[in-house]
Every structure is written in C-alpha cells, then in structure tokens.
Amino acid sequence: MSHTFFNSRLLQYKSPFGAVTANTQVTWHLDVPENFGYVDPHLVLTKDRETPVHYRMEFTGQSQGANHFQVKVTPTSSGLYFYYFDLYTDFRKICRGAGAEGFLTWTLKDSWQLTVYEPDFSTPFWIKNGTMYQIFPDRFNEGVPNKEMPFADRIYREDKTGDPYFWPTEQEEGYLNRDYFGGDFLGIEQKLPYLKNLGISCIYLNPIFEAHANHRYNTANYLKADPLLGTNEDFARLCLAAKKEGIRIILDGVFSHTGSDSLYFNREGRYGPGGAYRDRHSPYRSWYDFDSGYACGYRSWWGFDTLPEVQEESPSYVEFVCGKGGVIDTWLGLGASGFRLDVADELPDAFIEKIRAAVKAHGEDKLLIGEVWEDATTKEGFGHRRTYLRGHGLDTTMNYPFRNAAIDFVRGADAAEIADRILSICENYPPPALDCCMNFLSTHDTERAITAIADEPANGRDRFWQSGRRIPLSRMEDAVRRELLAYALIFALPGVPCIYYGDEIAMQGYRDPFNRAFYDWHSTERRLRGPLANLAELRRSCDA
C-alpha cells in the first residue's frame, strides 16, 4: 500500500526524543504523500491497558511532495504508553504503526512505545562518567593466606590455578559450591592501587554476607560478613580505603530468598534449635510459605530446596531489610554506596519502593541497581507491568540488551540490526536510568567475554566438555581484538561500563562455575589492560 513517513527516533517527527517526564508536551509529525488524496490522520495514544484516546492531527503545510501533519499531547501521569496513527480516507480507515516500514496497512501491525516517568526522578551523578568493576569476592585476591576454614564443610583450595569444582565430592549428593579459594576484603584492599590505575571508580561486590556456598547467594546471616572474607569492621576499613582512592563500593542484595542453611530457616540445624523450619513459633516463620503442596514442603526459588523463598510482603521481613538497624541501614552505615538487587524482577514493586526509600535515606547519592535481563520498561510480573523504572523504584538496571548486542556485533551480526536493538533501549529508558545503566560483557551469570566472543557456544554440553575448553593460541590475537572492540562499544554507549574481574587479562570460561575462576595475578596477558584504562580515562574526561 501507499508509503507514509514517520520515524520515532528523528526529532523532526517526534520531540523530545525517547522517554519524557509527566506533564511534558510531546509533538508528533506525520508526512503523507500529496497524491494520496484526502486524508484525516489521528494519533491513537493508549496508556498501558487503558482505553485508546484519539487525537486529530493538524495540517501544517506541503513540501517535497508531502502533506505535513502534527499533533501535540501532554501526558499527565507516569506510565507506559503506546501509539500509532489512524488515517481516515474517503473510503475507509487505514493504519500506520511500528514495524510496517513506513507503509500503510489495513490492520495495525505494532505500536510505538512512549515511556513517561516521574518528574522528580534523578540518579546519582558520581556514577555517570565512571567505570565499574565487578568482583566475585572468593576469587579475586587472598590477603590472608593459608586460611583456617571457619566451618568444617568448606574445602580450601591451595591451588589457585585450577578450575572451580564442578562435580559432587564424595560427601555431597549434588554439587554444593563448597570449594573456597580464599579471596577476602584485605585482598581487595591490597589491589585498590591496581584498580585505580585501571580507571575504576566503583566496585560491585557479589554477596559478602555469611552463607554456606562460595557464591553466597544462599544467605545465612544478613547482618554479618562471611568470616572467610573478614569482619564487618574489615569491610568498613575496605570502604574507607577505597574512598581515599576515589572508589565507591556497592553490594549485592539477595532479598528474594535465603539459604535453607541459615539463621532464619535453619533446616540443616547449624544454628541451633530455632529457625522457621524447626520452630513454628520462630519470629522468622512468617517470612516463608510452608505448604505440603510444594515438593519440599515450602516455596523455594525455582524449585531449589536449599533456597527457600521469602514472602516480601511480610511486615517483619520488610522491617528487617528496610528498617532502622536493618540490612540496608547496617551496610550503608558501614560505608557501602548502594545495592544491586538480585532477581529484581521477582521482587514486588512495593518492596522495591521500600528498599529505595531505605537506600535514599542515607543520601540521594546512594545507588540502587536491579538485575533485569530484558528491556526493563516493558517487563511483566506478578500479573502486571512492572513499574520499577519510572522514578519510584530502581535507579537503573543491568543492561543485558547492550551486552548481547555488543557481543553479537563483534561476532559478525548485521550492524543495522544491532543499532536498532541499542536504539530501542535508548528510546525506551528514562534518561536518568539510561545514564547509569550497568553496561558489561561478562558477569558471574554469563560466559566470560572472550569465550562468548571467540569460542564455540556450549549449546547444552556438559560441564566436563566446558572445563577443558580454551581458545587456541593461534586465534587469541583475533579474540583479544574482538573483545577490545566490544568493550570500546560498551564504553561509548550511554550508561556505565563495567569490567568483570579478569576480563582485562582475557580470562576464559563458560558459565558457572567456569566464569568464576581465581584471578590469575601471574598472567602475562597485557593487551587489554592499557586500552581499557585509556577508555576509562576518556570517559572520565568527557562531559557527553
């Protein structure tokens, strides 16, 4: 059918660009060929899951063989809006929607998105021209060598060069993540000069609370540092030392579940006779959902019986996390500058808003990042559209869409398609959130950057296959160049680049646990460190 032109990413057709605050006037322009004949175009704007509203467009003139129309609308409340154009002719109504490549269709193909966020939404300025560095605490650097294990069921790894264990030991029914390489707070403190020279301004630490697995996502005690890392006082000293180097530290907040082996649940009995599992009168009982309908007798995270889910609506749990003297208050008081929320899209919006209030009570400069793997503006959960990126929840999110786009690009994907994916996030995210998105190539949940870029996809192959994989030396030069190109893209895009520990020396590895090896401080790989430090310096000196 006939062609009509509109491009949501060009200011001549929609202004302002992208997301807007509530009570901001938005102007749309539409071009229709003169030879189309009579046409009466309307903007159809729909707030998410509400009734569409039609706005008649005004004719503004002719030029270059096209009739020009415009309409101005001011959304008065935050939310997710969708829009398209209806064109009424002498004969019938036709549509112009996203995905139609400029052509009119009899039926709507798709709509454009308009994100409207709260006018007072702001995010910490200090993070925006800096560079983050993610550390898996057990695997970075051991400051106190030859440790005594604080619990008998932990295995100390004296050999720092081997793969993390990926099979059950003779004492285990399944792989329990109980091998420890001994990384600690002092080890991180010792490497602060190295991180400063790399251009790092913020360290993101995977969980540090007492827990009985090396990943520490099965929290045992929220108010106590894991003894293998050090004490709460050691953490405070680390924060103070980092601050002197111009580096802030944010923590991983795991609030959707605890460990079964914890002070709160205590299925294994490590913490005496109390705990929700053993004592019906435990003060923690209301945190959990006990029901014989569950395979293990209680609701657990994705069916893992070692990770009982908490009920985030429980008043006592909310108070424990968000109240005075609670988890957030304690760790921010010790010197942390914010939190990254594990599985944020599995936390209720109301709970996230309470977490935000607790974080910001320590200052508007405190940061709250959410783990979301998709476009966070359109994410659904709990039977409704999530609202956590509109100004009253998260500051920002982890930017998996950018990560996937950067890796696909250096692996040879079509540049125009990659640009479209990147621009979609830029268009949908509120600028305060976009400016501090956590942009990365690797994390503890993904393949190492160089592995994802230059090695064969695992495609479901078992851990024994993954453990033996290394990129051939003959291909390493090309692999390093591609990784650097991907990082250059990440550094150049809106948001905050984040280097996963060891990426700067081209550490390899597929997913857990192979992406969590101990940092090789004897590595002779130097091809990435200098360029990454230069990229960090360029960001720091650039106002854009």
Question: Regions from the language model: what does each represent?
Answer:
Residues 1-133, 201, 362:
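Glycan-association/targeting regions that enable binding to alpha-glucans and other polysaccharides
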Residues 30, 135, 195, 205, ...:
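Conserved, mostly hydrophobic/aromatic
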Residues 32-34, 47, 73-77, 89, ...:
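Short, flexible loop/turn elements at secondary-structure junctions
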Residues 124-129, 196-198, 243-244, 332, ...:
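Extracellular/periplasmic catalytic domains that process cell-envelope and extracellular macromolecules
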Residues 127, 143-180, 374, 412-413, ...:
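Loop/helix patches that line or flank the sugar-binding groove of alpha-linked glycan CAZymes
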Residues 131-133, 203-205, 249-251, 339, ...:
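Hydrophobic faces of well-ordered beta-strands that scaffold small-molecule active sites
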Residues 136-202, 208-334, 355-361:
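Substrate-binding/active-site clefts of carbohydrate-active enzymes
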Residues 239-248, 256-257, 262-273, 327, ...:
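Active-site-proximal helices and loops of the catalytic beta/alpha 8
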